């Protein structure tokens, strides 16, 4: 990220987060359609959604909760969420070798890295250059399972995709909220 106005840094980070979230949501739907029987789908009201590792992070869970946090806190939560996916996402291309949706899966890792760099650039700007090194959360999510003939592996991947989608939605929401707070745009729909 070259030196640029803070508003541009936020705009770029929001766009990257939106793009990744849409890609995650599309992939989740494609995976569900292709591999998960109707009665086992999370979208069914009676089924239990996957437990996401990110639920153990003390990140805000709703918009009201997020509005109580400082921009720096929201950036830290966003960074932790993004970093928790850097390792597992590298296995996505093996899981979705023949998927049209994930034809760009090799680029998901790069897109996540770009978003990570964007968040770190925002943190440096807001901390006036006193940015501490990134803290990579351990443990992160497990790797995706490349065995798609095994029902347990399918359900594990399905759960991971669900968490990936949820976490990217959180990051997108936090970034939009900060951008709206700082620049008071009239079209601030979160």
Swiss-Prot record:
Binding site for Zn(2+): 19, 172
Record-level GO BP terms: animal organ development; growth hormone receptor signaling pathway; positive regulation of growth; positive regulation of receptor signaling pathway via JAK-STAT; response to nutrient levels
Record carries keyword Disulfide bond: yes
InterPro entries noted in UniProt: 4_helix_cytokine-like_core, Somatotropin, Somatotropin/Prolactin, Somatotropin_CS
Name under which the protein is recorded: Somatotropin
Family: Belongs to the somatotropin/prolactin family.
Known role: Growth hormone plays an important role in growth control and involved in the regulation of several anabolic processes.
Key words, A-Z: Disulfide bond, Hormone, Metal-binding, Secreted, Zinc
Gene Ontology cellular component list: extracellular space
Location relative to the cell: Secreted
Single GO molecular function: metal ion binding
Tagged with keyword Disulfide bond: yes
Chief location bin: secreted
PANTHER family: SOMATOTROPIN, SOMATOTROPIN,PROLACTIN
Disulfide bonds, paired cysteine numbers: 52-163, 180-188
Organism: Crocodylus novaeguineae
């Amino acid at each position: 990220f070259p030196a640029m106005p803070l508003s541009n840094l936020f705009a770029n980070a929001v766009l990257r987060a939106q793009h990744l979230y849409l890609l995650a949501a599309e992939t989740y739907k494609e995976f569900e359609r292709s591999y998960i029987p109707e009665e086992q789908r999370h979208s069914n009201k009676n089924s239990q959604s996957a437990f996401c590792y990110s639920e153990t992070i003390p990140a805000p869970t709703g918009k009201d909760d997020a509005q109580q946090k400082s921009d720096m806190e929201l950036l830290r939560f966003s960074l932790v969420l993004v970093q928790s996916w850097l390792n597992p996402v590298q296995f996505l291309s093996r899981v979705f070798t023949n998927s049209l949706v994930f034809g760009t899966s090799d680029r998901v890792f790069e897109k996540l890295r770009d978003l990570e760099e964007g968040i770190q650039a925002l943190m440096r700007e807001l901390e006036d250059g006193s940015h501490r090194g990134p803290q990579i959360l351990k443990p992160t999510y497990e790797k995706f399972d490349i065995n798609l003939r095994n029902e347990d592996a399918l359900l594990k991947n399905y759960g991971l995709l669900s968490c990936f989608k949820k976490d990217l939605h959180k990051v997108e929401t936090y970034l939009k909220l900060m951008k709206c707070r700082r620049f008071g745009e009239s079209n601030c729909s979160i």
